[in-house]
Amino acid sequence: IPIQILFIPIALVALIPTLYKQGGVSAKLGTSATALEVLQGRLHMHWFGLRDDPPTHELSKVLPNFSALGHWTLLLPLYILYKISGKIFYPVIAPEGEEEVLNLVSNRTIYFDELISNRKGQAEQFVVLGAGFDTRCYGLLKASHLKLFVLDQSATQQLKKQQLNTAQVDCSSLT
């Protein structure tokens, strides 16, 4: 992709604080860097119009171990290309059976969204184990009748709760 070549110097500058926040700051806070992976993938989906996800967008702006600006800078060439061509190169939702590692979060997100939407009328509760910085319970399921539970390691859960409050994301739907 030729446009990306022009952005290599900018991407390198953006990559350093992005990696530092995700790895270094996460370690200092006692949270797992991988707890950010779902948030990262869904944020990218939100930016490219594949999934409306305001809670993820708001949380990403306040987390001390995530650089929304860094991610935006890294994806800017792909976003410009998308706006020019109308084609999304990343993130991509692959057809069923053609998924690859690159599509893991986006495909899994869409699959689970559909599964949850189809079954939530038959359930009483929804439990997210190892939730990390997942925000599904603050958006998609917020208005449901379900009792919602989000479980993770203590440090991750405390940081998430504090930062959701800072971002003014309504958490009242959680039990």
Question: Where do the protein language model's features map onto the residues?
Answer:
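Rossmann-like AdoMet
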Residues: 1-125, 133-174
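Class I SAM-dependent methyltransferase core
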Residues: 128
